């Protein structure tokens, strides 16, 4: 029998993107849900949420609009997000976040 999935919704992020040659003043509005390994992982994430959100804000603000265009770009951002969240958890040697799901993605 497969374990019941555990999800954690994060508050929406609104960040200014890094300007590139063609665009400046671009904004990313992004909503995420994390699929985590267990209820214990969710509790650990909630405990360290300010640090995790800070890491994600930095990650998102380092992107350009061109880097976020297309399905492959979104898949790459999801992978980077998963890596950043897992790296922000203290003392963890295995991935605790197993998937990143976008529930809002607006590039302005």
Q: Where do the protein language model's features map onto the residues?
A:
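Flexible, low-complexity charged segments
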Residues: 1-108
């Amino acid at each position: 029998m497969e374990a019941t999935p555990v999800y954690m919704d994060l508050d929406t992020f609104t960040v200014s993107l890094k300007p590139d040659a063609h665009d400046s003043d671009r904004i990313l509005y992004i909503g995420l849900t994390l699929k985590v390994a267990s209820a214990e992982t969710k509790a650990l994430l909630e405990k360290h949420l300010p640090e995790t959100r800070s890491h994600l804000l930095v990650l998102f603000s380092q992107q350009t609009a061109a880097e976020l265009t297309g399905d492959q770009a979104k898949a790459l951002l999801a992978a980077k997000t998963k890596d950043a969240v897992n790296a922000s958890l203290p003392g963890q040697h295995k991935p605790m976040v197993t998937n990143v799901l976008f529930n809002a993605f607006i590039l302005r």
